Amino acid sequence: MRKVLLVEPVIFIYIFASSLTSPVVQQFIYRKLWEEEYNSTAISSDNSSHCERNKSSPTYVMEKAIQEKTSFFNMQLDLTGAVPSLIVAFIIVANGDHQGRKKSLVLPSIGALIADIFLTIVSYFSWPTSVLFLATFISGLFGSMATFLGGGFAYIADQCHDEKQKTTRIAVIDLIFGVVSGLAGLSSGYFLREMGFTWTFATASLLHVVNIIYITFFLQDTVHISEFQQQAPLSYKEHLKETFSGVYMLFKTAPSKKRILIIVLLFIFMTYLFTMFGGSSLFTLYELDEPLCWTEVYIGYGAAAFTSISLTSFLGVYLFSKCLKDIYIVFIGIFSYIGGIVMAAFAKTTLLMFLVRVPSLFSIMPIPVLRSMLSKVVLPSEQGAVFACIACLEVLTGTISLSVFNVIYAATVAWFSGFSFLLSASLCLIPLGVLCWLLCTSWNGEDLALLVPEEVSSIDSVDS
């Protein structure tokens, strides 16, 4: 059977299925906690959720209490899946340099399938929300989103030999991520309204089945595995040694300039991801609360509005990369995020909340550009190692960020629900400061492209 080097459909299906369930899970938890706490159903209408605005009303106090409980529950759920997925992402993505990229795509898909089956059962049989911790832990054991994206980006990097093409291809994946997650978010409200929780989770499960079949039987690997490797597979101990030695050699044998650049770029990536993930993750809870009081359909509209940010960020990367260095594109993206998140902190009407997306039009640009900058500074044989580091940082940073911001939101929602957004904007000063230092030194974007050819030429001279 002829196989194809087309990973985009895999990413499309996985992101759609995951984004379809993500806002639905938050609403499912919100409603289940309400039922468990007050032995009644959370009320909603066609236009707005039942959201008490009178602060002296007992219902208002009850809603704030459920907001806090939901926030803490989400934090605990994220931590449950983060620890195993952190280890698995590091091992599988780094091993992709020698063992192939398909493992890092198919295993997270299997984990997501198991998690969605659990969600379907919990919803259908009205099991307690505590069962969700088991589903999240199992999903983490299969690598979760970090392993999938790490493998996907490494797969793309393997096919790119031109530096500008690499930046654009990586930006395309982030575009797919944003557009598809927006479309899934938009449709999630209608899925939930027309089909309910159970069939929404079942639909996501079927999508993951399709993905597993495509990856297994139709997707060609970009890493050639020799017949000797297939006949004499490495032991578990040798696998671990190969994994950690690859990442260790990435930093140990590299010139000091390259090593410092990698560390600095990873730090910028990590700090920006921390602020952006943390602030953005609170949107659903913020929109459910008064004075917005959005329903599942409006929450879907809000998620779909994120699509425009992904599209404009991709166009920004495509156009700006023709006339600006990568580092300036990162600057523009961070300032764009700051403008949007500050506006969200004071958004008290539905119109204003939708308009938050306008100043945020380029806020996603730093993510693909920083990935591309890191990919450019390493050798082709080190792509898996660097994307393994990125994947682990994404899991670690994302989990800590979600946990920290959920705790802060729970502690501040009663007196100012927008405080967490202002904190997120303030923390952006950290990556901005490091970028300014990087810009003031001689290590600008042009140096990134010069380091790899020097190493390649030195390796070639040794081989000859």
Curated annotation (Swiss-Prot):
Pfam families: MFS_1 (PF07690). Belongs to the major facilitator superfamily. SLC46A family. Lysosomal proton-coupled steroid conjugate and bile acid transporter. Preferentially recognizes lipophilic steroid conjugates or bile acis as endogenous substrates and seems to mediate escape from lysosomes to the cytoplasm. Modulates hepatic cytosolic copper homeostasis, maybe acting as a lysosomal copper transporter and sequestering copper ions in the lysosome. Keywords: Glycoprotein, Lysosome, Membrane, Signal, Symport, Transmembrane, Transmembrane helix, Transport. It is found in: Lysosome membrane. Residues 1-26 form the signal peptide. Residues 27-71, 126-130, 193-198, 281-296, 348-349, 406-418 are extracellular. It comes from the Eukaryota. The chain crosses the membrane at residues 72-92, 105-125, 131-151, 172-192, 199-219, 260-280, 297-317, 327-347, 350-370, 385-405, 419-439. This is Lysosomal proton-coupled steroid conjugate and bile acid symporter SLC46A3. It catalyses: estrone 3-sulfate(out) + n H(+)(out) = estrone 3-sulfate(in) + n H(+)(in); 25-hydroxyvitamin D3 sulfate(out) + n H(+)(out) = 25-hydroxyvitamin D3 sulfate(in) + n H(+)(in); cholate(out) + n H(+)(out) = cholate(in) + n H(+)(in); glycocholate(out) + n H(+)(out) = glycocholate(in) + n H(+)(in). Glycans are attached at residues 39, 47, 54. It is a multi-pass membrane protein. Its main location: membrane. Residues 93-104, 152-171, 220-259, 318-326, 371-384, 440-464 are cytoplasmic. GO terms for biological process: vacuolar transmembrane transport. The gene is SLC46A3. GO terms for molecular function: symporter activity; transmembrane transporter activity. Gene3D superfamilies: MFS general substrate transporter like domains. One of its GO terms (cellular component) is lysosomal membrane. InterPro entries: MFS, MFS_trans_sf.
